[in-house]
């Protein structure tokens, strides 16, 4: 069960350790670099070889045939659920579409903001046949579609027969994606970043993954010849803030829902007193007994803990210091806490706000910053699939009025060619 820590009794160093996340092996970076180099050098051949090495599959093709996508079929109840999710996710991301605005900053000057969709985007969905992560696809494909990205490609690992789960194919089809590659892992990220004979090189890569995928995204993002990325999304995490009135059964269920993602996931409960902590631990044991991903859960809980802290100011400091991917405020008057939160990927309010709902059907995006990146990153949105540039119009009146100031600043910085570009125009107007 979860280790219980009394915050007031911890030293400053122990407090830091209490909020530390599982560390990634330094060997991963070297392994991923080797994979990226192999894809860059050998292209499609490397993808076939690496898939055989890591997935133990002899692929017959890299790109899923169009006929296979069109003929994919799933049970009606699954189709209904996907359709409902598409509706709410589309509504939310439509609301985020920006408007092209124009402002006059001075007489004779107008500046217009213009938004454009990124032309080529690559979506990554982890998991093979046993775990078709349809929701991960929807959370990327829908904002890409809403933004108007003309080229959308999907990479996802194949199953043992080299095929893609039909739930993924149907969801992709419903979201307007017809270019799908049966490739997973760091090699998929490398293929989309640099392109191969078969895989389209994209401008930006999206999607979560394991430590290899996250490392690959980080490496291609710092290479000028690679591709931009959405965010460095690592292992999933949740932090729950609960008072004495919170339902321990609900809390345990939310902790387990996050813990089952993988062995490096982390869950933290902050509560006022030991009684609730003990009740939650009891519930964890009860609920774990009938869950399927028990090995993942056990490893995750070993990285996790319960923090006893009765001081609300300190509770707030813990939250903002940790900057959780998911924050559940399961206590009285949860709304009153929101204005004090400065670092969180997404916040769930009240006892009925199961984090699972946000993962699938509320419409909000579940691709969120982890590992403390919520301090300076936001969850995925329509804007991430767009670029913005400004259009500046300057007439004669403006250059007469503001040109001398521009020249003075240019000369202050020792850039006389800058000053000259204005002076020549002023001279022309003076003739």
Curated annotation (Swiss-Prot):
Pfam families: Histidinol_dh
Residues engaged in binding substrate: 236, 258, 261, 326, 359, 413, 418
Keyword Repeat: no
Annotated residues for binding of Zn(2+): 258, 261, 359, 418
Keyword annotations from UniProtKB, A to Z: Amino-acid biosynthesis, Histidine biosynthesis, Metal-binding, NAD, Oxidoreductase, Zinc
Cofactor(s) needed: Zn(2+)
Protein residues bound to NAD(+): 124, 187, 210
Active site residues of this protein: 325 (proton acceptor), 326 (proton acceptor)
Biological pathway: Amino-acid biosynthesis; L-histidine biosynthesis; L-histidine from 5-phospho-alpha-D-ribose 1-diphosphate: step 9/9
Enzyme's top EC category: oxidoreductase
Keyword Oxidoreductase: yes
UniProt cross-references to SUPFAM superfamilies, sorted A to Z: ALDH-like
Domain of life: Bacteria
Note on how the cofactor is bound: Binds 1 zinc ion per subunit.
InterPro entries cross-referenced by the UniProt entry: Ald_DH/histidinol_DH, Histidinol_DH_CS, Histidinol_DH_monofunct, Hstdl_DH
Gene Ontology biological process terms in this record: L-histidine biosynthetic process
TM helices/strands, residue ranges: none
Function: Catalyzes the sequential NAD-dependent oxidations of L-histidinol to L-histidinaldehyde and then to L-histidine.
Family membership noted in the UniProt record: Belongs to the histidinol dehydrogenase family.
Protein name in UniProt: Histidinol dehydrogenase
Source lineage: Bacteria, Pseudomonadati, Pseudomonadota, Gammaproteobacteria, Legionellales
The encoding gene: hisD
């Amino acid at each position: 069960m979860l280790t219980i820590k009394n915050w007031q009794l911890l030293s400053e160093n122990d407090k830091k350790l209490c909020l530390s996340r599982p560390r990634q092996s330094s060997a991963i970076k070297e392994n991923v670099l080797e994979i990226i180099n192999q894809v860059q050098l050998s292209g499609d051949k490397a993808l076939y070889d690496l898939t055989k090495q890591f997935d133990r599959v002899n692929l017959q093709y890299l790109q899923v045939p169009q006929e296979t996508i069109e003929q994919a079929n799933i049970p009606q109840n699954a189709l209904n659920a996907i359709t409902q999710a598409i509706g709410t996710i589309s509504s939310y991301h439509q609301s985020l579409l920006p408007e092209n605005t124009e402002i006059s900053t001075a007489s004779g000057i107008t500046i217009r903001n213009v938004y454009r969709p990124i032309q080529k985007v690559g979506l990554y969905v982890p998991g093979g046949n046993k775990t078709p992560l349809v929701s991960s696809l929807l959370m990327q494909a829908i904002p890409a579609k809403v933004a108007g990205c003309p080229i959308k490609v999907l990479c996802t690992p194949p199953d043992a027969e080299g095929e893609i789960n039909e739930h993924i194919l149907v969801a992709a089809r419903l979201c307007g994606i017809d270019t799908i590659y049966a490739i997973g892992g760091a090699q998929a990220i490398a293929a989309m970043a640099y392109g191969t004979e078969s895989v389209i090189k994209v401008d930006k890569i999206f999607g979560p993954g394991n430590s290899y995928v996250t490392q690959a995204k980080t490496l291609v993002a710092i290479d000028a010849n690679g591709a931009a990325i959405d965010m460095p999304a690592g292992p999933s995490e949740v932090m729950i803030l609960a008072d004495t009135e919170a339902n321990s059964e609900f809390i345990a269920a939310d902790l387990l829902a996050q813990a089952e993602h993988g062995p490096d996931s982390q869950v933290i409960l902050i509560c006022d007193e030991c009684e609730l902590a003990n009740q939650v631990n009891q519930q964890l044991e009860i609920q774990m007994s009938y869950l399927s991903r028990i090995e993942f859960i056990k490893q995750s809980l070993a990285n996790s803990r319960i923090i006893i802290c009765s001081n609300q100011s300190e509770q707030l400091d813990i939250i903002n210091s940790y900057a959780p991917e998911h924050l559940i405020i399961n206590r009285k008057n949860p709304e009153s806490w929101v204005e004090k939160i400065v670092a969180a990927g997404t916040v769930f309010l009240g006892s009925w706000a199961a984090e699972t709902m946000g993962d699938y059907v509320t419409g909000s995006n579940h691709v969120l910053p982890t590992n403390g990146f919520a301090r300076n990153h936001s969850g995925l949105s329509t804007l991430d699939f767009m670029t913005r540039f400004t259009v500046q119009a300057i007439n004669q009146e403006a250059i007469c009025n503001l040109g001398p100031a521009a020249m003075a600043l240019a000369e202050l910085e020792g850039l006389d060619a800058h000053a000259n570009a204005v002076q020549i125009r002023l001279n022309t107007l003076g003739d």
